Structures are given as structure tokens and as C-alpha cells.
């Protein structure tokens, strides 16, 4: 990230993330009242429908413009080494995406044995209200979404965004049959690959997949960015 500290970037991203499109909301309220008054005073149904349709279109356009205006720009200029390392991560995620189903394993069930699981799909995307010169791998993890930028993971939940530098990330990946300490969610004959991401700042995400090698490649690429 350029021209600013990591803390300043996170503050700016959180301001943008929490900002609501106030102008669009006001316009929606005004147009809604206008439609109600038109119906109350006997305006033709066709004219009211046309006005309502145009009002909805105007609110959508204004909302998008407002969100774009208040978005934060995050630009990257990578040296050759960082470029190679980051491309390795993007390539590894692409392979993981095409390797078969990927499951995020959440908290354990009440019996303490099984974990809740949810099907997820890696994508190239950006966090809400962020503009950038790159698209980054993103992965849902329960109520959080993990965005893998070149210098850190940005974690977005329903209330805020926070960052984890790769040197502070503990990552494991490979064949779940070769580990016992992570509690990887039981035996699934079709999903022997796993990827575990942990940090002292509170991240704890566990994924299962069909391709053991793809999971190991993602873990290796993440370690290469540390």
C-alpha cells in the first residue's frame, strides 16, 4: 500500500465500509412519499408507475455514484520478487477453485464432535467500497470474508475490517489424514485436503477440499508472502 501507514489505511477502509449512502436513502424516501401522494390524490396509474420506475432507477444510480465517491483507493506497485510471490498465490487459488467443492468448517456442534460446514467458492474480488489496481483472491469464512492482498489479509465482518500481516499468519495445508491437532471435522472420503488459517489477532478459519495438492499449494504460497 502506498503513501500511508497500515493503521491509517485500515481507519480509512473502516470509514468507507461503515458509511451509508445517505443521499440515496433521502431520495428514496422523497420519491416514495411522492408516489404515495400521487396515488392518494388520484394520479393516473400509468403515470404513477412510470414515475416510480424512474425514481427507482434514479435511486440506484445515485447510490452507486455515492458509494463510488466515498470508496477508498488502495494502489499497489510490486517489485519483481513480490510480483512472483503474489502470482503464485493467485495461481494456487485458481487451482483450488477448480479442484472440486470447498467447505468452510465453522464452530463445533453441541455434541462437540462435528462442525457446521458451508460450501464456499474462491473468487477474485475487492472488499466493499475499495478501489484498487488489482483484484485479489477472496474466500468466505462464516460471517467473515478474507481478502488476500499482496501485503496482508484484510478480514471483513459485519461490523468492521481488520488486517493480518502474512508474517503473523499461521497457516497449514495438505492432507488431513496426516494431522491430528487441528480437529479438522471428521473423515470425509471425498475431502481429504485441508487449509487452516490462524493468527493471534483472532482469525481462526478451517477449510476442507477434495484436492490435497491444491490446498498445500495455497498454504505454501501464503508462507511465501511472509
Which residue ranges define each predicted feature?
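Hydrophobic, membrane-inserted alpha-helices
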Residues: 27-37
Amino acid at each position: 500500500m502506498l503513501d500511508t501507514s497500515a493503521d491509517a489505511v485500515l481507519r480509512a477502509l473502516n470509514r468507507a465500509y461503515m458509511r451509508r449512502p445517505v443521499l440515496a436513502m433521502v431520495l428514496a424516501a422523497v420519491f416514495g412519499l411522492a408516489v404515495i401522494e400521487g396515488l392518494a390524490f388520484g394520479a393516473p396509474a400509468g403515470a404513477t408507475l412510470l414515475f416510480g420506475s424512474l425514481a427507482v432507477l434514479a435511486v440506484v444510480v445515485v447510490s452507486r455514484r455515492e458509494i463510488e465517491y466515498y470508496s477508498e483507493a488502495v494502489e499497489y506497485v510490486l517489485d519483481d520478487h513480490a510480483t512472483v510471490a503474489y502470482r503464485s498465490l493467485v495461481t494456487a487459488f485458481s487451482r483450488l477453485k477448480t479442484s472440486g467443492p470447498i467447505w468452510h468448517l465453522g464452530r463445533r456442534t453441541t455434541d462437540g464432535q462435528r462442525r457446521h460446514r458451508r460450501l464456499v467458492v474462491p473468487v477474485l474480488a475487492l472488499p466493499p467500497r475499495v478501489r484498487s489496481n488489482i483484484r485479489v483472491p477472496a474466500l468466505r469464512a462464516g460471517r467473515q470474508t478474507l481478502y488476500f492482498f499482496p501485503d496482508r489479509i484484510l478480514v471483513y465482518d459485519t461490523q468492521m475490517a481488520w488486517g493480518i500481516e502474512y508474517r503473523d499468519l499461521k497457516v497449514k495445508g495438505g492432507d488431513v489424514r496426516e494431522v491430528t491437532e487441528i480437529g479438522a471435522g471428521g473423515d470425509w472420503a471425498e475431502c481429504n485436503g485441508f487449509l487452516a488459517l490462524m493468527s493471534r489477532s483472532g482469525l481462526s478459519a478451517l477449510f476442507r477440499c477434495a484436492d490435497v495438492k491444491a490446498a498445500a499449494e495455497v498454504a505454501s504460497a501464503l508462507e511465501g508472502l511472509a
